[in-house]
Regions:
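Acyl-donor binding region in acyl/amide transferases
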Residues: 1-10, 124-190, 197
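A conserved beta-strand-loop-helix scaffold within acyl/acetyltransferase catalytic domains
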Residues: 1-140, 185-186, 218-227
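Short, surface-exposed, polar/charged, turn-prone segments marking secondary-structure boundaries
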Residues: 15-18, 43-45, 57, 81-85, ...
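C-terminal catalytic domain of photolyase/cryptochrome flavoproteins
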Residues: 65, 78, 111, 157, ...
């Protein structure tokens, strides 16, 4: 744990998908052991069986109505938890006006109605997943909208990495790889900062052990058993 002035460095586990020059989603699935390959296919099929289709919008093709729809889904995620959204519609409209930012939205559709969406941002070599929401409760819709659609988009567009956001051991079984990331935090009170620094040092040792365990325990390994 390094401390410089009022800043602390905190390490944590992060899940990243890597594109090993896959030609298609089916090609990607060939890396998996048969059991987990079947599980993923079953999850995707369950969405198709419910007549859910996806429409991808990116950049300037995202009109104002689409942003309104996305925002309503984003808010629903917080309402379901009894919370208030911390971003407002003005923020999303500001994104739409920034030409240097490339948003990508995966809209889930039932018949002609949008029923959910995930918002990503496309960088030079990475797709970043950040927000999602839905106005229906449907098993596996989150995995399809937030993981599989993004993976397929990366494969089809030659994008090297997919960063779907922090947390979620369930990403491991779907092919995301764990790595160590660093965040910086400013703590002005010295006593408080020293206490946090001590905790973070101990935590980092545990994170290192956790990451090594995850690397040896993946859906590509013959010993993979995560349920």
């Amino acid at each position: 744990m390094r401390v410089k002035s009022c800043w602390l460095y905190k390490r944590y586990a992060w899940y990243i998908w890597k594109n090993y020059d896959y030609q298609s989603f089916s090609d990607y699935l060939e890396r998996f052991k048969s059991r987990q390959r079947k599980n993923i296919l079953k999850e995707r099929k369950s969405i198709k069986d419910e007549k859910i289709e996806f429409e991808i919008m990116s950049g300037s093709s995202i009109n104002e109505d689409a942003w309104q729809k996305l925002y309503s889904f984003y808010c629903q995620t917080y309402f379901d938890r009894g919370q208030r959204p911390y971003l407002n519609l003005k923020f999303f409209k500001m994104i739409a006006d920034k030409k240097e930012i490339k948003p990508v939205i995966f809209f889930a559709k039932y018949k002609d109605d949008f029923v959910g969406a995930s918002l990503c941002f496309e960088g030079s070599d990475t797709l970043y997943g950040r927000h999602w929401g839905s106005n229906i409760l449907l098993k596996n819709l989150h995995f399809e909208a937030c993981f599989y659609q993004g993976i397929e988009y990366c494969i089809n567009n030659g994008i090297s990495y997919f960063d779907p956001g922090i947390q979620g051991e369930h990403k491991l079984r779907r092919g995301f790889e764990v790595s160590k990331k660093v965040s910086m935090h400013m703590i002005s009170n010295k006593d408080f900062r020293d206490a946090i620094a001590s905790f973070c040092k101990d935590e980092e040792n545990e994170i290192d052990r956790y990451i090594e365990s995850c690397k040896a325990y993946t859906p590509f390994s013959i010993d993979y058993r995560i349920e």
